[in-house]
């Protein structure tokens, strides 16, 4: 059974957690306010979900989803994510995140910024172009004829296969 660590358990993270548990995976939920604030969500999702800290989710996740406002990416613990596949859902919103010169100039993409912060991880961009409610309502089991597909992007072929 795969364990999915979620660094961020808001709309996208909570939806990904529900879908992962429905597919039989364990999930580790985190947010910036601490595990106590996620106990109700973990209970709602079921026994395969557990509220924890960001570091514990990074250490315990076989696959880790970073789904936080982009301005918070420096808080993502790099060392425990070394050698792991990290799914980046972050989008840059200057009005929320503040100005990030490398992104404003086009010198870097948001995923390149995160990859620079996580140099020993394989970062794959996914889930950043779909409304969280559609992510849930369009979910189908593997092999379903009406299954939706989401684009992903990354430099590591094996990591993209894992996602």
Short names for language-model regions:
Residues 46-48, 52-98:
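Rossmann-like NAD(P)-binding element
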Residues 38, 73-74, 160:
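Short, well-ordered alpha-helical microsegments
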Residues 90-141:
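Rossmann-fold NAD(P)-binding glycine/threonine-rich loop
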Residues 2, 84, 148:
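Nucleotide donor/acceptor-binding cores
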Residues 41-44, 52, 116-123, 131, ...:
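Internal alpha-helical scaffold of NAD(P)-dependent oxidoreductase catalytic cores
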Residues 1-44:
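NAD(P)+-binding Rossmann beta1-loop-alpha1 motif at the extreme N-terminus of oxidoreductases
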